[in-house]
Amino acid sequence: SIEEIVKSGKFSFLDNLNVTFSKGWERSKKLQESFRDSLDKDRALGYTSKGPHRMDITFQVNNKKASSNLSRGQLKILILLIFLTNIKLIKQITQRETLLMIDDLGSELDVKNLRSLIEQIILSENQIVLTGIEGEEMHQSIKKLTNFTQINL
């Protein structure tokens, strides 16, 4: 989970990460009640305004929105960690292997964060396709893979 990764200390900028969920309808109502109450409005609008499809997940760091508080590289790390967590959940539920494809992994990342992120990707035990122009920095980190092929274009 992201919480386990944060506790590992590999990405210290996430130490004060807070994740909140809003379910997409009023807290005081059950889903069916919310659907009923908004039916006329939804028909007029032509779409369903309440429901799980309206759920929001908000990430905050130091009590500020992550999107406005983190650098582009830090946001990239957070998003990839979310994907890795979701992939782990998908594998547990479906009992199927996944393929993780990441283009230009190293862009906007310093060497330390690139190595830490690659370590998390390797730990996910997925089939992985990575692209990048980083060369040696990325190559050193992925040498840990048992079945590794590098293609230089």
Model-derived segments and their meaning:
Residues 1-99, 108, 112, 116-127, ...:
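Conserved NTPase motor "head" modules and their coupling/switch loops across ABC/AAA+ ATPases, GTPases
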Residues 131-133:
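H-loop/switch region of ABC-family ATPase nucleotide-binding domains
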Residues 141-153:
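A short helix-turn-beta junction within AAA+ P-loop NTPase domains corresponding to the substrate/partner-engaging
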